[in-house]
Design a protein with these regions (language model features):
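Extracytosolic ligand-binding ectodomains
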Residues: 14-442
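N-terminal signal peptide c-region/cleavage motif recognized by signal peptidases
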Residues: 8-10
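Sec-dependent signal peptide recognition
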Residues: 1-3
Length: 442
C-alpha cells in the first residue's frame, strides 16, 4: 500500500502527503471512507493503487493511505516564513515528520529504505491510537539528487523532525537547512563526515568503526579485568578489525595486564601454549569473517578435548550474528560475547506481531537482513516522535528522556562537545552454557 510515487524512477525528488492511515472496519464502504475525510473517491484510489484493480474488494483490517484533498490544501502546505527553534510552534500532540531517503524500487538502497519507511508508517499508525498524531511528508532522494528543490518545498520547513539522508554528500545542505529552521535531523544509517560535531540539530544513529571499537574495548575492560586475553591472528589481509584489537591491546598494556598472541596456522601444541590453565581465557580474533571463525572453533575443540578443564570464552563481532544459525551451538559452548547495537528476537511476541502486521499491510515479508530495516524504522520513529511530542525542542534523546521500549534497536544519545547528539547505545549478547542469552546493556 505505497503511493505510486515510490515506483516512479524518472523523477529525482518527489513528495507525498497524507492525513491518515485508516484501518478498514467491517461495514465500511469506499464512498463512506472518502466522505469521512472530505476527499473524492478518485483521490482515495490514486493514493492506494490496489483499489484501481478490476477485482478489488474492500476488506476489513486493510490499511488505506488517506491523502489530503487537492481541493482543500492542508495547513502544512501553506508557505510560511522561516522559523527558529525559539519561535517554532507545534500543534499539541501532532508531530510533522519528514522522510528524505531513496524511496524507490530501482536498486538495493531504494528497496531497503522503502522497507525502513514502511516501518516509520507503522509506528505512526501505532502512535495515533495512543493520541499522538503525525503529518508525514516523504521525498524520494536518489543518490545523485540535488536537494535544493526538496528544501525549497514549503512542507520541508514545517517539519519538526526529518529522517535522512542516506548519502553523505546530501547531509550538509539538509543539516544546515534543519539548523536554520529549528528542525531535528535524524541520520539513521552510515555516513562519512563529522557534521554531528558542529551541528547541534543532528541526531546521528550510526556508530563509526572507531567509535564502535572504543565502546567494545570499554566493555571488555569492564567485564574481563581478571581474565587472560588470547589474540588469534587469522591471516586475513582484508580485515578491518585491527581498529579494535589495536585499541584493546593498548588498553591492556596501559593497565599492566598481560595477554597472549597466537596464530590460526599454529600447531595444536603451540596454540595451546597461549592459554592459561588457571584463568578464564577470552579469545579475540582479528577478523569477523566466517571461515576463520570456523577454523578457530575447530582448534578450540581440539584444545578442549586435550585440556577439558581449560576455561574459554569468545569475544566476537557484530557480523557473528549473521552466522548464528550455523555456529549458535558453539556460541553457547564457548560463552560467546557479541557486541551489537541491536537485538533481533523473532520469537518476542511484539516483534512477531509487527512482522505479521507488516505482511498484512504490504503483502510481503521483511527482508532477511540484520538488523531488520522495517523494525529499525519503527523503533526510530517511535523513539523520536514520542520524545518530541513530550519534550518538544528540549528533546535530546538521552537515557533520562527515553519514553519507549524498542523491539530491536535501542537508542541512547550523548552530546558531542558543542555539536549534535551521537547514539552511544551498546549491547553485549552473552551466550551462556545453559543455552540462554544474557543481554548486557551499557
Amino acid at each position: 500500500l505505497l503511493c505510486a510515487w515510490l515506483l516512479a524512477s524518472s523523477v529525482v525528488a518527489q513528495t507525498a502527503k497524507w492525513q491518515d492511515l485508516y484501518k478498514v472496519k467491517k461495514k465500511d464502504t469506499i464512498y463512506g471512507i472518502a466522505h469521512k475525510y472530505n476527499i473524492t473517491i478518485e483521490e482515495l484510489m490514486q493514493a492506494n493503487p490496489d483499489m484501481q484493480k478490476p477485482d478489488y474488494v474492500l476488506k476489513k483490517g486493510e490499511q488505506l493511505l488517506i491523502p489530503f484533498s487537492k481541493q482543500t490544501p492542508n495547513a502544512a502546505q501553506k508557505p510560511t516564513a522561516p522559523t527558529s527553534t525559539a519561535t517554532r510552534q507545534r500543534v499539541a500532540n501532532t508531530v510533522n515528520v519528514g522522510v528524505m531517503l531513496p524511496l524507490h524500487n530501482v536498486d538495493g538502497d531504494g528497496q531497503r529504505m522503502t522497507e525502513y519507511y514502511r516501518g516509520v508508517l507503522m509506528a505512526c499508525d501505532s502512535l495515533r491510537s495512543q493520541g499522538i498524531n503525525t503529518n508525514i511528508f516523504a521525498w524520494n532522494l536518489y543518490k545523485d539528487a540535488d536537494v535544493s528543490p526538496v528544501l525549497a518545498d514549503a512542507n520541508a520547513k514545517n517539519c519538526n523532525l526529518i529522517f535522512g539522508p542516506l548519502y553523505t554528500k546530501q547531509v550538509k545542505p539538509i543539516a544546515d537547512f534543519c539548523r536554520k529552521h529549528g528542525i531535528r535531523l535524524v541520520i539513521p544509517f552510515s555516513i562519512n563526515g563529522g557534521d554531528v560535531e558542529t551541528n547541534d540539530h543532528i541526531f546521528q544513529v550510526y556508530q563509526s568503526k572507531v567509535f564502535t571499537a572504543e565502546l567494545s574495548a570499554n566493555a571488555f575492560m569492564n567485564r574481563f579485568k581478571d581474565a587472560h586475553p588470547v589474540f588469534v591472528d587469522c591471516n586475513d589481509s582484508t580485515s578491518d578489525k585491527g581498529i579494535f584489537t589495536s585499541e584493546l591491546r593498548k588498553r591492556l598494556e596501559a593497565a599492566g595486564l598481560s595477554y597472549s598472541i597466537t596464530n590460526l596456522k599454529s600447531s595444536p601444541e603451540m596454540f595451546a601454549k597461549a592459554f592459561s590453565a588457571v584463568k578464564q581465557n577470552v579469545v579475540i580474533l582479528n577478523t569477523g569473517r566466517s571461515p576463520q571463525l570456523n577454523s578457530t572453533l575447530a582448534k578450540l575443540n581440539v584444545l578442549r578435548a586435550t585440556f577439558p578443564n581449560v576455561r574459554i570464552a569468545l569475544f566476537g563481532y557484530n557480523e557473528w550474528l549473521m552466522y548464528k544459525r550455523v555456529y549458535q551451538d558453539y556460541y553457547y559452548k564457548y560463552e560467546a560475547y557479541i557486541p551489537t547495537a541491536y537485538v533481533y528476537n523473532e520469537y518476542a511476541p511484539a516483534t512477531a506481531n509487527l512482522e505479521r502486521s507488516y505482511r498484512q499491510w504490504f503483502k510481503s515479508d521483511m527482508r532477511q537482513a540484520l538488523p531488520r530495516f522495517a523494525l529499525t524504522g519503527y523503533d526510530q520513529a517511535q523513539f523520536f516522535i514520542r520524545g518530541i511530542n513530550k519534550y518538544g525542542v528540549k528533546f535530546e534523546g538521552t537515557q533520562q528522556q527515553n519514553t519507549y521500549t524498542p523491539l530491536q534497536t535501542p537508542l541512547k544519545f550523548k552530546r558531542v562537545s558543542n555539536g549534535g547528539m551521537q547514539n552511544n547505545s551498546f549491547i553485549l549478547l552473552h551466550y551462556k552454557p545453559n543455552r540462554t542469552i544474557e543481554t548486557i546493556s551499557y
